[in-house]
Amino acid sequence: MDAAIRGNDVIFVLKTIGVPSACRQNEDPRFVEAFKCDELERYIDNNPECTLFESLRDEEAYSIVRIFMDVDLDACLDEIDYLTAIQDFIIEVSNCVARFAFTECGAIHENVIKSMRSNFSLTKSTNRDKTSFHIIFLDTYTTMDTLIAMKRTLLELSRSSENPLTRSIDTAVYRRKTTLRVVGTRKNPNCDTIHVMQPPHDNIEDYLFTYVDMNNNSYYFSLQRRLEDLVPDKLWEPGFISFEDAIKRVSKIFINSIINFNDLDENNFTTVPLVIDYVTPCALCKKRSHKHPHQLSLENGAIRIYKTGNPHSCKVKIVPLDGNKLFNIAQRILDTNSVLLTERGDHIVWINNSWKFNSEEPLITKLILSIRHQLPKEYSSELLCPRKRKTVEANIRDMLVDSVETDTYPDKLPFKNGVLDLVDGMFYSGDDAKKYTCTVSTGFKFDDTKFVEDSPEMEELMNIINDIQPLTDENKKNRELYEKTLSSCLCGATKGCLTFFFGETATGKSTTKRLLKSAIGDLFVETGQTILTDVLDKGPNPFIANMHLKRSVFCSELPDFACSGSKKIRSDNIKKLTEPCVIGRPCFSNKINNRNHATIIIDTNYKPVFDRIDNALMRRIAVVRFRTHFSQPSGREAAENNDAYDKVKLLDEGLDGKIQNNRYRFAFLYLLVKWYKKYHIPIMKLYPTPEEIPDFAFYLKIGTLLVSSSVKHIPLMTDLSKKGYILYDNVVTLPLTTFQQKISKYFNSRLFGHDIESFINRHKKFANVSDEYLQYIFIEDISSP
């Protein structure tokens, strides 16, 4: 070390507290002076009431100092307690400084401890009401930058220690242009208490921290990195709330005004002491005022308000700055596209390889916890606090403004662990499946080891299906519609018609239903007859609400329409149930629009009866007949003589149990996918079979007999008038009585009388009170010569 560095015997002192910076820099003799040690001692002897404060003359040019500490305890310890406390104090602070010197300065731990414990001086305050002293470690040298960097370490030591002296260390002295009262001098002219020397040290240089006289016993260390490198250029991080908002919070805490409030900025707020105008007692501890100012520090994402001097003489207040940090966490989670807002206002969450609604359980909270380890370290620790997690969750909900359209992949079948492509048979999982935002799924995991064609379950299943719908020439059309209907339940798109499963009891309708439910899980829902017989959009309708996004709806056990009082199927309902959107809300909810993707299957033992029949209705009805009866041995003979059955098979008593245990789940799913590829690629095809409905017979036939009259028929009026037609208002019409006579040639009035009367009542018009007519022409009347 350079000789100039090893020694300094010129002591620079301030003559009062609060010397202006300009006077200090210009070394105005009214405020500052420099002394040799003997000169300083004579000056104090000659001026016993003087106030002198030791300081570095020019920190940039020379900043080597002895390690020193200022301890100020607002209590008087007796001699025994003091000796015990001072001994522990020396051990604690030497260990603390040695650890810091080893970590940040590369010093030898043992050498630092040895130099500090072997040689130090202690002053003693003449104030009998408190325990106050300055301690100078005479052979342990460092730089002012090092002491400033050590400030936080010593502050943490003072907080954690149980030693009253250690807890009373004033860390505020470790700052730029710091000062320490010279031994034997007053704090101000009106204060008669001073610090005095104690044996064995009776030379003034032993009590000066800027006096440097290195020898063989001395030990010097300094920061390996500059203080500027340890402290960030900008204290205020982007993740914090705005600095202005934070300082306003600080101001509200004090209640009393902060005189130098406008002097605080992002770069200096930790170094500028707060000057408080104590109009009222301190808001933190209720004391009338404080001798030392409060100061701010920045730790762990929060502003810490503490008092300089003895920091324990006032409460410490923490102001969290994590508002924007929690907002940034929410933004980062949103950037993963793992939380979306649906068009119905629901939140869906991508968790465990599938999209799920956030309604039944707090899935957003679970997502936040599961995604925590993917976030930067400074963010992940914040999410361990339940309060902050709730804040992040609220931020996520508030930030989700734009809704997304979901469930727009009709050829994708969602599972708990991924998505099955019905077209190419590929199964997507993880991020590959994430892009298919399907909010409902089967509710079970796809297992490709069971999704195979060659298996004992498949062999058993095929026998069951072939018993229910035999592969015969007579049943070929029926079997094809059966396969089309069931495989269409995989498709997530609106179906053009409803299918009736019509047959007597014990013909396999319920078995088919249970197989389908096992294969598609939660995409299947069973509902009641009310969706067919009651007004749909009148009040809450949980039956319709439960259909939202389901792919199969089974309506079981229609009433016997021959019974008096039974409601007929409303044709308006049939039309509405084939629309993409069905109106119906759950109880206590305003969600009325339900997306209709379901294949609606009506399981009935009785032929359906409709309140009104027209072409629109007939285009929306398909019928699959079930004519194989499954009987117990005791009833087999009677069943074989029943014309309603084509075949009679023995009932397998254990079949229901196997289906409920999902034995045939993946076998039937494989079969459905196979049928889907056969019938519904490239487009889904499901055609009506109105000819299978007895009530439709009249309307199907009459459509081949009549056409509506128009102006193009007027030139034919010469021939038509001979057949009973008349011209009324330039329209060819047929009088009601003539129409009844002509129609009776095609329909038996005893069988179709009600249908004929309904048709007439719907289409007849009045020429006057007594004359009625229809604007129809029989096709044979205009096609025959």
UniProtKB/Swiss-Prot annotation:
InterPro entries membership: DNA_primase/NTPase_C, Helicase_SF3_DNA-vir, P-loop_NTPase, Phage/plasmid_primase_P4_C, Viral_Helicase-Primase_Cplx
Subcellular location: Host cytoplasm
EC class name: hydrolase
The EC number(s) this enzyme carries: 3.6.4.-
One annotated Gene Ontology cellular component of this protein: host cell cytoplasm
Listed GO MF terms: ATP binding; helicase activity; hydrolase activity
Keywords: ATP-binding, Helicase, Host cytoplasm, Hydrolase, Nucleotide-binding
Coiled coil: none
Stated role: Multifunctional protein required for genome uncoating and replication. Major viral uncoating protein that is required for the release of the viral genome from incoming viral cores containing the viral DNA genome. Possesses an ATPase activity that is required for hexamerization and uncoating.
Subunit structure: Homomultimer; hexamer. Interacts with OPG148.
Family label: Belongs to the orthopoxvirus OPG117 family.
Name the UniProt record assigns to this protein: Uncoating factor OPG117
Gene name tied to this protein: OPG117
